[in-house]
């Protein structure tokens, strides 16, 4: 069975009710649920939450609900903890082939990217797929502060041409895919063989503050404009 798991904890320190905050007429979690269904990649779309309000909203959009363990409802629970809790609960009830861990603040992510992840996972030879974006400039020429002065992080790259520097990538925190047929047991020490899909421009934006939220709205509005 192919599962999409969307984590949506009720508590949020910096933006109140962030996972169900109104975003162009819909709770923002709607966009992840809707894209999961429209992609036609999953047998089940499940929201992991501790909130009755979030559960009711997610149900109204067609998602199933998994009430997560109480010890996974604070700011210290990791994504792997949440996934492990879900997999251990369901593995005796249903056979899971793969799992997509899709974040709820994903209005920019495209269905095309979800399908690319699935295709890459289907090719095998890996346990996990992550979604990344390339840094605009190489971190080999990054600076650090030392004793109130600034200097190159790696002195040997100071005179290198930009075209001779390596490309570096960052985790976008949009979704993770796991081939559960190749993962007998989840644990923090497991070394996942991981491949990546590189995102196009304007497919993700980190939202940690209300200022970030307002920027996200502008990017989304611009994407809607480009589609006209």
Label every model-predicted segment.
Residues 42, 94-96, 123-126:
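Short, high-confidence coil segments that cap the C-terminus of an alpha-helix
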Residues 107-199:
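Conserved core of the sugar-phosphate nucleotidyltransferase
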Residues 41, 61-62, 146:
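Short, structured coil segments at secondary-structure junctions
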Residues 41-46, 127, 202-203:
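Short active-site oxyanion
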Residues 185, 197-198, 202-228:
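Hydrophobic helical membrane-anchoring modules
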Residues 46, 52-100, 108-112, 116:
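Short phosphate-binding loop-to-helix
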Residues 1-48:
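N-terminal glycine-rich phosphate-binding loop and ensuing alpha1 helix
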